[in-house]
C-alpha cells in the first residue's frame, strides 16, 4: 500500500523531472527559466470557474508550474480578479494551511474585459501581457473556454495581436470540434491557416483520466493480456458512459448537439482507439496517435441498423423535480425534439486483429447510475465440463467513479462441495493506493501543454476519421427525423439496447456485480 510519504516522493520526482535539464524526455520537461503566461478566454464562464482556475491553483500549489507563471482572464463581462476569485472559491478545495499560498496564486492573476469580435480588446490584452512579462521573452498558452461560434474571430485576433514574439505559443481548444465532417474540416482548415499542428491542443478531458491513461500500460506492459488481445480470444468489447441526471435546465444547449456528439463521437471513440490500436513504435505522442488513426481508418461508418436511440421521460415516482421532468418538458427544449439522450452504437473494425469482434459504445443521461468503464468480454470456454455453469471471463477497466481494474473469473466455492462461482481479481485504486493522490484530468492535460506533450490531445487526422464514422448517421437522424425510443428517468435505458448487445455477442448472466471488492446480485 502506498503511503503519504511515498506519494510526496513521487511528486518530488515529477517536480525534479520537470525542472532538470538532465532528465528531459518527451512531455516531462519545461524551461523553468523563461516566464510563462496562461490566458483564459471565457474567464467568466462555468468551465473557467469550475475547472480551469481550480486546476491552475492545484498545479501552482504543488509546485508543478514553471516559475514565474502568471495568469490573465479575458471575457466580455466587466469583472475584477477579486470577483473571479469569489466565484471560484467553492471549487478550489483550499485547505486552511494553504491560505497564504492561495493568496500568492491570485496575486499572479490579472483580468481584461473586451469583445471577441474586434481588435481593441485584444490590443488591451496584449498590453497587459507585456506588462506582466516586463516585455521579456515569454511563452504563452491561450485556453479557449468559448462557444464554437467565436472560435474563428478569437483565433485570428490571437494570431494577429497576442502571440509571443520570442517565446512559443500554444492554443488549447475545447470541444465541440464542429458538428459534422464538413464543419469540423472547415475549423481545422481555419486553424491550420493560423497555427502549426504542434501549437494546437484539442482537449478531450477523458484522455486525462487515470484509467484511460492506464490503458496502454495494461495492454502493452502485460504479456498475459497482450497475447490474448485479439479476435481469437475476445468475444465483444462494451464501452459505457452513464449519468444519473438529465439536462437539468441545460436542455437548450444539449439539444443542439445530442448525446452522440456530446459523448460517443469523442470520449468513447477515443477510448475505443486506445483499446483497439496496434502497439506503437514508442511512447512518443506522434507514434501513439499514428496507431490511433490507423485503427480509426479500419472502422466502418455507423448505420441506423447498428444503433439504438433513446430519450428519457419523467418518472412520476421520482424523488425530485428533475427526476419527474422528461427531456422535452425542459422549458429550453422544443416539445417535438428528436434529440437522443441515449445512444448505443456497434462499431466494426475491419483488420486482422479485430475482424468480427463487435465494439459496443453506449452512453446516456438520466440512467440508473453514474459509471464509465471498458468491459472486455472473453469468449466461452470450449468444451465446458462444468455443466454450462461457466461464465465468460471479463476484464473491466473502471474509469469512474472509483478507478479500478478487475478481472472476472471462475473459481471453486469454499467448502466441502465442488461448486463453482464467479469472482474477481481486484485492483481497486482506493484500496491498493490508499494514500495516493490521483490528479484531476485537467491537471494532467494542462501540465502536458506546459511540457509540450500532445500525447493526450486529439490530432486533426484523428478528428477527420471520427467524423467520417459518425457524420452519415447524424445526418440521417436529422433529415429523417428519427424518433428515439422513450425510457424512464432512473432506468437502465431502452430495453432494445440490451437486445442489441445480445445480438452482438455480449452475454450478461445477471448474477454478479462488482462493488469495489464486494459482489452482489444486480442488474447490469
Swiss-Prot record:
Determine if Electron transport is one of this entry's keywords. Answer: no
Q: Could you tell me which pathway this protein works in? A: Carbohydrate degradation; pentose phosphate pathway; D-ribulose 5-phosphate from D-glucose 6-phosphate (oxidative stage): step 1/3
Report the subcellular localization.
Cytoplasm, Cytosol
List, from the UniProt record, the residues annotated as the active site of this protein: 267
Membrane-spanning ranges: none
Task: Detail which positions bind NADP(+) 2.
Answer: 362, 371, 375, 398, 406-408, 426-428, 492, 508, 514
Source domain of life is Eukaryota
Please describe what this protein does. Cytosolic glucose-6-phosphate dehydrogenase that catalyzes the first and rate-limiting step of the oxidative branch within the pentose phosphate pathway/shunt, an alternative route to glycolysis for the dissimilation of carbohydrates and a major source of reducing power and metabolic intermediates for fatty acid and nucleic acid biosynthetic processes.
Q: Which NCBIfam families match?
A: zwf
Q: What is the protein named?
A: Glucose-6-phosphate 1-dehydrogenase
Q: Which organism is it from?
A: Drosophila melanogaster (Fruit fly)
Amino acid at each position: 500500500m502506498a503511503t503519504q510519504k511515498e506519494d510526496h516522493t513521487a511528486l518530488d520526482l515529477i517536480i525534479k523531472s520537470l525542472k532538470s535539464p538532465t532528465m528531459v524526455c518527451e512531455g516531462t520537461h519545461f524551461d523553468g527559466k523563461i516566464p510563462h503566461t496562461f490566458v483564459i478566454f471565457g474567464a467568466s464562464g462555468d468551465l473557467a470557474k469550475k475547472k480551469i482556475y481550480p486546476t491552475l491553483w492545484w498545479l501552482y500549489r504543488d509546485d508543478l508550474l514553471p516559475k514565474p507563471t502568471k495568469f490573465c482572464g479575458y471575457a466580455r463581462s466587466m469583472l475584477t480578479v477579486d470577483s473571479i476569485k469569489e466565484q471560484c472559491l467553492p471549487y478550489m478545495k483550499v485547505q486552511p494551511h494553504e491560505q497564504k499560498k492561495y493568496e500568492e496564486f491570485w496575486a499572479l492573476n490579472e483580468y481584461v474585459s473586451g469583445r471577441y469580435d474586434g481588435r481593441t480588446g485584444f490590443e488591451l490584452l496584449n498590453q497587459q501581457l507585456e506588462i506582466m512579462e516586463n516585455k521579456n521573452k515569454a511563452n504563452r498558452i491561450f485556453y479557449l473556454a468559448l462557444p464554437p461560434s467565436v472560435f474563428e474571430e478569437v483565433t485570428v485576433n490571437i494570431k494577429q495581436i497576442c502571440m509571443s514574439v520570442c517565446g512559443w505559443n500554444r492554443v488549447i481548444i475545447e470541444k465541440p470540434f464542429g458538428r459534422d465532417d464538413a464543419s469540423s474540416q472547415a475549423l481545422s482548415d481555419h486553424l491550420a491557416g493560423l497555427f502549426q499542428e504542434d501549437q494546437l491542443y484539442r482537449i478531450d478531458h477523458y484522455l486525462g483520466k487515470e484509467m484511460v491513461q492506464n490503458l496502454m500500460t495494461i495492454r502493452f506492459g502485460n504479456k498475459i493480456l497482450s497475447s490474448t488481445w485479439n479476435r481469437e480470444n475476445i468475444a465483444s468489447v462494451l464501452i459505457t458512459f452513464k449519468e444519473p441526471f438529465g439536462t437539468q435546465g441545460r436542455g437548450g444547449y444539449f439539444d443542439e448537439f445530442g448525446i452522440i456528439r456530446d459523448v460517443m463521437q469523442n470520449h468513447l471513440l477515443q477510448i475505443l482507439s486506445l483499446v483497439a490500436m496496434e502497439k506503437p513504435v514508442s511512447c512518443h505522442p506522434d507514434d501513439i496517435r499514428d496507431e490511433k488513426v490507423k485503427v480509426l481508418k479500419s472502422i466502418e461508418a455507423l448505420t441506423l441498423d447498428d444503433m439504438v436511440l433513446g430519450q428519457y421521460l419523467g418518472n412520476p415516482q421520482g424523488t425530485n423535480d428533475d427526476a419527474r421532468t422528461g427531456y422535452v418538458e425542459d422549458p429550453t427544449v422544443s416539445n417535438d425534439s428528436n434529440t437522443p439522450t441515449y445512444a448505443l452504437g456497434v462499431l466494426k473494425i475491419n483488420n486482422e486483429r479485430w475482424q468480427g469482434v463487435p465494439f459496443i459504445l453506449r452512453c446516456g443521461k438520466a440512467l440508473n447510475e453514474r459509471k464509465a468503464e471498458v468491459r472486455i468480454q472473453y469468449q466461452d470456454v470450449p468444451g465446458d465440463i462444468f455443466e454450462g455453469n461457466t461464465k465468460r471471463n471479463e476484464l473491466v477497466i473502471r474509469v469512474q467513479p472509483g478507478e479500478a481494474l478487475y478481472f472476472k473469473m471462475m473459481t471453486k466455492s469454499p467448502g466441502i462441495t465442488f461448486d463453482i462461482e464467479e469472482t474477481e481479481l481486484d485492483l481497486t485504486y482506493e484500496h491498493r493506493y490508499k494514500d495516493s493522490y490521483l490528479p484531476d484530468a485537467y491537471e494532467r492535460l494542462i501540465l502536458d501543454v506546459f511540457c509540450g506533450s500532445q500525447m493526450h490531445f486529439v490530432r486533426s487526422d484523428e478528428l477527420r476519421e471520427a467524423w467520417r464514422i459518425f457524420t452519415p448517421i447524424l445526418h440521417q437522424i436529422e433529415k429523417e427525423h428519427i424518433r428515439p425510443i422513450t425510457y424512464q428517468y432512473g432506468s437502465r435505458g431502452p430495453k432494445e439496447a440490451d437486445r442489441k448487445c445480445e445480438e452482438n455477442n455480449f452475454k450478461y448472466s445477471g448474477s454478479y456485480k462488482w462493488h469495489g471488492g464486494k459482489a452482489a446480485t444486480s442488474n447490469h
